[in-house]
A protein has these predicted regions:
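The substrate-binding groove and active-site-proximal loops of carbohydrate-active enzymes
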Residues: 181, 296, 359-371, 387-396, ...
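Loop/turn elements at helix/coil->beta-strand transitions in domains of secreted/extracellular proteins
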Residues: 353, 385-389, 408-413, 448-453, ...
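Active-site neighborhood of glycoside hydrolase catalytic domains
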Residues: 428-510
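Aromatic-lined substrate-binding rim segments of carbohydrate-active enzymes
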Residues: 389-433, 515-523, 528-531
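Substrate-binding clefts and catalytic carboxylate motifs of secreted carbohydrate-active enzymes
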Residues: 16, 190, 455, 502-515, ...
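Alpha-helical scaffolding within the catalytic cores
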Residues: 338-344, 400-402, 437-445
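Secreted/periplasmic carbohydrate-active enzymes, especially glycoside hydrolases
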Residues: 1-389, 541, 627-628, 632, ...
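Hydrophobic faces of well-ordered beta-strands that scaffold small-molecule active sites
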Residues: 356-358, 390-392, 414-416, 544-546, ...
Length: 912
């Protein structure tokens, strides 16, 4: 008989536990005691309480402070359970995710205790002795407040350093449930992933690890399969004449792979292995000649192959069956020492990938609410931003298969953190055992996904240990380093050696080098946001930037829907509550001030300028780093998404609305990026050094090729000898240059560079060649006619290549003598009838035009962010969710704003 799985979705209830020994929050509201509520499973108790009207939405206004009692209380989920084996030998209770500290019982008889949100559990119900009929038993999952479990562990481990006054390091639970510098505190409990009954006989497929490689054009799938045999039947359960133990049977494993070949055919290949009674599994290898390869987006197709794994008797009866998709590709990360330090080069199918990534946080603080449709919407947005890598950050969870399947389909590479973030973690029991179990479980579970290329030991823990002086508080107590340097890499190597493991982010490749060193592997650039202006991103060229970001509030409608302050200002209570970063409002103001001046108390002005500053700051970093390839091989912006309406570093807010940053990232992450930057003296070439010993493998380290920057407007000099430091060539030299990064192809085109005054009048113009014989960076030296301005407050430099544009402002915007923007706006219905096409035609220089249809209609969206137009130019905006009745509002402030208007209003106020 084939394994039968019955998911337990219906018939659940949840209630507060009040037995005298359990925890009940002191501020428990009326109406909660003694109430039994219908429960959603998979789910968490917050949603059930909210649905029943017993809990206000924690994300609305300042309700967060009124909902903390939920996480401080104990909760019990119950339902009736049928444990009839129905002819099978085994009946297992399978819990794919329990959040977090739970006692399970059947008719009051204990089953097990759990204490880890991040792993799966399976319980043999034959071991639970109960009486009475098999179809009316009560299953109870009683969840204890995570705070009390954390308190018990903390009492044994002692106080350990961390960023917040919350005990998340002491319990294996989503850390950001306890709040973060972008997140509210909502400590959840509940069966957050499916609960099921599985009935089976003889044996089942216990674990499947499909590890792929490519050898001489042939796809190779090594499927590591572990079996569990049923064992003897207990307690006299009747199963007829079945073989009751399965221990003496030979079994057969069959693996079938079908999918595309390089020439467009569909192929099917099959292999099998016989498993004797003394064996608990086998490795079944399937070779697929001429298999089409899986590539990251932008580098090729995402060829996926269907895999079917069957466990059969020798007579061919199917006992268990699994199916999934995988992709054939080789993948790794090169970190061998070169002339500039240690690179961090993500390599897929032998090609170094120009990584343009986004950091992912949990998309909801009630993480069970995130379904496949939500994942798809967010990941589609990442694709639309032209990202090719998503880093799953270590304060969240290992996401569901839906997330990784969608990344597989979209060609989004995945960097997966183990869930350790920004704190010291105890290494003694019971946490150590839980870490081992969860790591083994998830490394195996996710091994089928071709998108997954990096496992990372932790987020910032080693770096913060050094810079924040944790050693003084810790003394000689272990604090997690053993996990990152020993335990986790050992598990990855044993369970899935096909994946690259990095110790931390940031990490320099060696304990002897400062973890966040710009010349070695991964770097987090947070000093800029926290302390200085964004032009300091240009101070260095890290090898790989795995975190950096700049804050802005959510889209206007999202902010207005979440906060009801009247009047609403940047400093009104609700707006401030929806800002969780330390000194966050002051840092926003500090970012605006040097470039735009003070935003004052006007919310419209503040909202516009913070959005513009976020986009400009991120552009400064990305342009600088990407145009210094191959010294820098990747940029991963913090962050893609949000889990509640908040001022944060996100490009997409919690309602799914795109900030202007999202549209700017489309430009910055394009395969071809045009930037105007200060003249750079950085030697971007990296040269191989004599073969060294790779300290991770003990063998020879791979060599890294030199990829020099092409100088197309100069005399063809080589990096490091370009004459830029020659005083005889410095007179009247342009302080800026055009840099063009082409990630996928060579180039043979021109860039049009104009120096214009603020009315839009052309003062000088040059057309300069841009030629690359392969992917790389072209640096275009500017003649003084266009690169040197006569009036720093009254001129700008504009570079155009095809449809791509870069603008250089010689002085801060606050000092520029911007003139009133003059333009004409016309509307027409979209061909699909779902909105309007807005065409704006400029009669003057129009700087940073922003259209915000969500200020007119809740469903309003726009396909562009900030735009700069020269006289005579036109731009088309596609607006959805609005209609002809909205036209007047769409062409009026504040739905349509330009920089000159915003700054002029502030000057008028200051002069009044």
């Amino acid at each position: 008989m084939t394994l039968d799985r019955e998911e337990l979705r219906d018939g659940w209830t949840v209630s507060l536990v009040e037995d005298g020994a359990s925890g009940v929050a002191a501020d428990l509201p009326t109406g909660v005691r003694g109430v039994t509520l219908p429960a959603t499973v998979p789910g968490q108790v917050h949603t059930d309480l909210e649905r029943a009207g017993l809990l206000p939405d924690p994300t609305f206004d300042r309700n967060e402070t009124r909902t903390q009692w939920v996480g401080q209380s104990d909760w019990a989920y119950r339902r009736q359970l049928d444990v009839d084996p129905r002819g099978h030998e085994r009946v297992d209770l399978v819990c794919d995710g329990l959040d977090t500290v739970a006692e399970l019982s059947l008719d009051g008889v204990p089953i097990a205790t759990t204490r880890n949100m991040h792993r799966r559990y399976r319980f043999d119900l034959r071991q639970v002795e109960t009486s009475g009929p098999v179809d009316g038993k009560e299953l109870e999952i009683a969840f204890e407040s995570p705070y009390r479990e954390a308190e018990r562990v903390a009492a044994r481990a002692g106080s350990m350093p961390g960023p917040y006054d919350e005990p998340f390091p002491y319990v294996r639970k989503m850390a950001s449930n306890f709040g973060w510098d972008w997140g509210l505190t909502a400590v959840t409990s509940g069966p957050w992933r499916p609960v099921a009954i599985e009935r089976w006989s003889t044996a089942r497929l216990a674990d499947i690890r499909p590890l792929v490689d490519v050898e001489a054009g042939e796809g190779v799938l090594d499927t590591h399969i572990a079996l569990e045999r049923s064992g003897p039947t207990l307690h006299g359960t009747s199963t007829g004449d079945l073989d009751l133990d399965g221990e003496d049977d030979d079994l057969v494993l069959v693996v079938t792979v079908s999918g595309p070949t390089v020439d467009g055919r569909t192929t099917k290949q099959r292999s099998r292995a016989q498993v004797t009674p003394k064996e608990d599994g086998a490795v079944v290898t399937v070779r697929v000649p001429d298999a089409a390869l899986w590539w990251p987006r932008g580098y090729g197709e995402q060829a996926l192959h269907d895999v079917v794994v069957e466990l059969q008797t020798v007579d061919g009866a199917v006992l268990d069956r699994r199916s999934f998709r995988t992709g054939f590709r080789s993948a790794g990360v090169r970190t061998a020492l070169d002339s500039a330090g240690r690179p961090f080069e993500v390599v897929v199918n032998g090609t170094v990938i120009d990584v343009r990534g986004v950091n992912w946080i949990p998309d909801d603080v009630i993480v069970s609410r995130v379904d496949r449709a939500r994942y798809a919407a967010r990941l589609d947005a990442a694709v639309d931003l032209r990202a090719n890598l998503v880093r799953v950050w270590g304060g969240g969870v290992y996401e569901s298969h839906d997330f990784y399947e969608l990344c597989d389909e979209r060609g989004l590479l995945v960097w997966q953190d183990f869930p350790f973030a920004c704190a010291a973690y105890p290494e003694d029991e019971p946490l150590r055992g839980e870490v081992i179990a969860e790591a083994q479980d998830n490394v195996a579970r996710l091994s089928r996904h071709p998108s997954l290329v990096v496992w990372n030991g932790n987020n910032e823990n080693i770096w913060l240990h050094d810079v924040d002086g944790w050693g003084d508080e810790l003394g000689d107590r272990p604090w997690g380093l053993g996990y990152y340097l020993d335990l986790l890499p050992t598990i990855v190597d044993a369970v899935d050696p096909s994946r690259f493991y990095t110790v931390a982010s940031p990490w320099s490749g060696s304990e002897s080098i400062e973890p966040n060193h710009v010349d070695h592997e991964t770097h987090h650039s947070w000093d800029v946001w926290n302390r200085v202006s964004d032009d300091h991103y240009r101070d260095s060229v890290p090898r790989f930037v795995s975190e950096f970001g700049w804050q802005a509030p959510p889209a206007w409608r999202t902010l207005r829907d979440a906060v009801t302050d009247e009047p609403m200002t940047p400093t009104s209570p609700g707006v401030v509550h929806h800002q969780k970063a330390a000194d966050g409002m002051a840092k926003l103001a500090r970012g605006i001030e040097p470039r735009f001046g003070s935003a004052g108390d006007d919310l419209d002005r503040w909202h516009y300028l913070t959005q513009l500053q976020q986009a400009r700051a991120i552009a400064t970093g990305v342009e600088h780093w990407r145009t210094h390839w191959p010294r820098n091989t990747g940029v991963v912006v913090w962050q893609l998404n949000d889990l509640w309406p908040v001022s944060s570093w996100s490009a997409i807010d919690s309602a799914g609305r795109r900030k202007p940053l999202a549209h700017e990232l489309r430009r910055l992450y394009d395969d071809v990026l045009v930037a105007i930057r200060p003249v750079s003296t950085v030697d971007t070439a990296v040269r191989a050094v004599p073969t060294e010993v790779d300290d991770r493998t003990g063998g020879p380290a791979p060599r890294t090729a030199s990829l020099p920057v092409t100088d197309v407007a100069g005399s063809g000099t080589v990096p490091g000898d370009d004459g830029r430091d020659d005083p005889s060539r410095a007179s009247d030299a342009s302080p800026v240059e055009v840099a063009v990064r082409s990630a996928r192809t060579g180039l043979d085109t021109v860039v049009r560079v104009r120096r214009i005054d603020l009315s839009g009048r052309i003062l000088a113009e040059e057309t300069l060649p841009v030629v690359l014989d392969r992917p790389g960076v072209a640096v275009v030296r500017l003649p003084a006619s266009v690169g040197v301005v006569d009036d720093a407050r009254g001129e700008v430099v504009v570079a155009d290549m095809d449809w791509r544009r870069a603008v250089w402002t010689p002085a801060p915007d606050r000092e520029m003598r911007w003139q009133p923007a003059r333009y004409r706006a016309t509307f027409s219905a979209t061909p699909e009838g779902d909105g309007l096409d807005l065409v704006v035609e400029a009669d003057s220089l129009v700087r940073d035009l922003l259209v915000q249809p969500d200020r007119v209609a809740a469903t309003g969206t726009v396909d562009r962010g900030f735009m700069t137009l020269l006289p005579g130019e036109r731009v088309r905006y596609r607006l959805t969710g609005v209609g002809e009745a909205d036209i007047a509002a769409l062409t009026s402030e504040p739905a349509l704003l330009t920089l000159d208007r915003v700054l002029a209003e502030r000057r008028s106020e200051a002069e009044a």
